[in-house]
Every structure is written in C-alpha cells, then in structure tokens.
Amino acid sequence: IQDVHLIDKMAHFDRERIPERVVHAKGAGAHGYFEVYRCMEEYTCADFLQVPKAKIPVFVRFSTVIGSKGSADTVRDPRGFAVKFYTSEGNYDIVGNDIPVFFIRDSIKFPDVIHSLKPSPDTNLKDVSRFWDFISNSPEAMHMITWLYSDRGTIKSYRHIDGFGVNTYVWVNSRGKRRYVKYHWKTMQGVETIDRHEAEILAGLDPDIAVRDLHEAIECGKYPKYELYVQLMDIEEAENLPFNPLDDTKTWPEDRFPLKRVGMMTLNKNPENFFAEVEQSAFCPANIVRGIEFSDDKMLQGRIFSYSDTQRYRLGINFTQLPINKAKCPVDNNNQDGLMRYDYKKGSVNYKPNSLNGNKPIEAPEERVECVYVEGNITKESIKKTDDFTQAGERYRGLNENEKTALIDNILSELWQVPEKIQRKLIEHFTRCDEEFGDRIAEGLNLKSKKSINKYKFK
C-alpha cells in the first residue's frame, strides 16, 4: 500500500469512465467553421449572421440515438446532427437529427418512447414488440415511421446525411419583428443510404464505419460541407394552417415556406482527443444568443431543461468551463464553486444588485421585443390540431415504387414478431395514412382475413 504511484495509477484507472449519454451515446465529432452567405438582418439580429463571408468556429457531433457506445453505426436509427456555434455573443447550439420530424409532439412522452426502444427492463434484450406497442398507441408517430423505416434510416457515412433542427425557434430582428424558424442542413456530398441487408452485414463487419469514414475523410483533406437553409413563417400565419407548425411530427410545406440559404459549414479538423472533445462535448437547445428565442414548441420546451440537466449529471455542474464547451467570448456571472471549478471570478462581490463593484456583471443588451399580448387561464392540454396521418400519407405517395417496397419490407421485417392485436391496430393507422400502404402491410402479414397469421418471411 506504500507504493503511492501504484495506488494513484489504479485509483485514476478505476474512475476513467463517466456516465454514458442515455441517448446519442455513440458518436463522432469534428471541428470546422460556418461561413455566412448574406446578411440576415431582415430576419434576425443574431450577430453571427450579419456579416457576409464571416467565419464562425463550430464543433459538430454526429451520433446514433438508441444504442450504447459500443453499438453499430449502421443500425436503423435516427442520427443526431448537433452543431455548436462559438459566436461573439456566446454559444448557440442547433441540436437536431437527420430526419425532419420526430415520434412525438409532447416532451412528456419522451422518456416513454426511449424506454420502448431500449432493451426490456426484465431481460435487457431488445424486443420490437415493445416499440411497436408504443407506436400503435401513438399515431402521431406515423410520419416519423415513413422516414425511419425507409432506407433513410440506415446509413454508413455522416458525410452523406442531411440535418434538421426539428424544433421550431423564433427569430427576432432589430425592430422586434418575430418569426418562426426551422433549420435545414443539406449535405453537399449528396445523400447516400444503404439497404437493410447491407446495414446488417456492416454492423458485424465494420460497426464503426461512419465514425471511421468521417475521420479518414477529414484526415486526407476531403472536408465535408453542409449548407444551412431556413424556413421562416410569420407568427400570425400559424392560425391559418391545417396543422400546428410547432408540432414536431409535421414538416412545413416548402412551396408555401421556401428554403432560404444562410451559409455553409465546413468540417476541416479532427479532434485531438476523443474523450476530451467528443465525449465531453455538451449540446443544449437552451443555448441561444440575442436575436433567437424559444417558441412554444412542446418538445423544445422539454428539451430546454433536459439537455442541460443531463450534462450536469454526466459532466458536473461546471461543464461549460470545459474547453470544448467554453464560449470564446467573455462570460461574467455570479455562479461559483461546485465540482471541478477552475475558472473563477476575482474579488469579493458575488451578488447583485451591488454598489461595491459598479453593479456588475452587466446584463448583455437585448434588442427591443414587441409586446406579446397574452390572456386566459393556464392549463395543461394537448395540441388541438393533430392530423396524424395526412403528411405520412403524402410522404408515402411521394416515394417511388422501389422506395415504397423498401419501406414496406423494412416494417414487415419487424412486425412479424409482434402480437396480432398490435399488428391490426398498426394496419388501421397505416391505412389511414394511405389505403395502399395499409393494404400492403396487411397482405405481408396475411391479415386480410381474420384467420391466424402466417409469420411474414422477410426477404
């Protein structure tokens, strides 16, 4: 026991691991920059979007969602697409996915959808019946299913995926004009997917293929590029739409709300240390800057708390002081102490208001925000405009025949393992999306009649 070098070495080794992310555990990261195409002052006073050709440092983390850190990159899953902008007024995080919609529209169901996708608590084995049971009782997920179970749900390269903010934010210009905004990243390498069979093979042969592909491409100078587009909507328009634009299970029609190009992101530097820069990177939808606000998007409102809270659990209360998360602009507040605090404020005044320190810190200036009139009783209620099936049906009918067949085959490859009562409920949902869609699922499960099914033998 007197060999203090041994004790110190072993003690450090025993504590090398930190809690794994509950979702998005397996990931890859890269540094780069974002170059603004044109001044966006008409729409937002966000400082980093005002000067054409300005280059803003960024860090990006791509990830799978459900699997643990040792899982395969090619499994059917949404992919996380999180971007941290190190702006002159603080960090701004766009924390999105490679699919424009999500399973649910209310954050209170988020733990439930994740629980249904994770291994069963009694056996720790993945059971697709649990997920499809949840989906059969959550028809708002139909639109997401048409994306996830197409070949967009299986990829082998993060360089060849698009990204979407999913949530709706608010942009505010210097005159106080507020607009809803949705973010779109479009890969300049072209979207590439793989089918289920190749995904299953690669999961065994090269489970880290997407992480490796990104690292090797940057290492040899093939820098991935992604263009940022936004859709903008006057807040007054929301009431006249047949759906709620703050519903994360919906997309905005591009013919009515066209995409506007904002700039281009280039990833040109690999992390020097994976743990320090990728594992300890912390993205939070709550990280916004002047000129950008939160909407009443129910999923966003839940994420504002949850993401910051999970980082405090994983990394400690002072996670924003870690180099990868630290803002590149000056930060001044009265936060103090806590585990692993190393950046500190000099002097004796750590409160406000005060006279001894000139009433500092001074709050960052905000642009004038137009008055928003609110009246009525506060209540807990669901989104009223649901329409769970129209956009899912439009998505299905927009696929070509090969894409439809792949979607059907991918769904059936799991549904044959599901109890018949859940199958029948899902067929009803698919039929409400599109009659052909429902018929093909029913045919694959031999459920045209009420006889006992023959298990679907997928290709």
Model segments located where?
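Active-site-adjacent core segments of small-molecule enzymes
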Residues: 1-459
